[in-house]
Amino acid sequence: MERKAILAAFWRAVAAQERDPLRGFFAEGAEVLWPNTNERFSVEEYLRANCEYPGKWNGKIERMLDTVEASVTVTRVWSEEFSVRAISFFRWQGEKILRLEEYWSDDGAPPEWRRKMQIGQKITEDGNGVKDILERDLAGEPVSIDENIIAVGSPAGDIKPVPKE
């Protein structure tokens, strides 16, 4: 299976909180790191944290880079109660995830101290996506997890649009 398809299927299983399909994406002895909270998980612990998270949520891969050794996804995850982004670094053993390092951050307004500085500009009007950036950078549209990934990197690391089929 092509790596972009593996990652799309992985994020579908994450959003659906499907424990058994998720388990199948990981190599034996794989580990998951969440540096923001200083946590290291075994696959079973990661499955528990993900699959027992309360509520239903959605996900959209906004960007993906792929090299021979590793992949990176930027994924928006949201529900009616929250919106976050996960920057995920995947190390592979064949077609299985050997190491997943994720950085999760809340979407929201800049902190008051920075608003007072009156610097910066909005990336998007609704604040929920990086559509404007992707259109400028890749001349593409963000994709839902159920669609094709719009960009992958070549082994040299450059970004190329992938046409929707």
Task: Give the predicted meaning of each segment.
Residues 119-165:
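Flexible, acidic/Gly-rich N-terminal and inter-domain linker regions that tether
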Residues 1-121:
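C-terminal and inter-domain tail/linker signature
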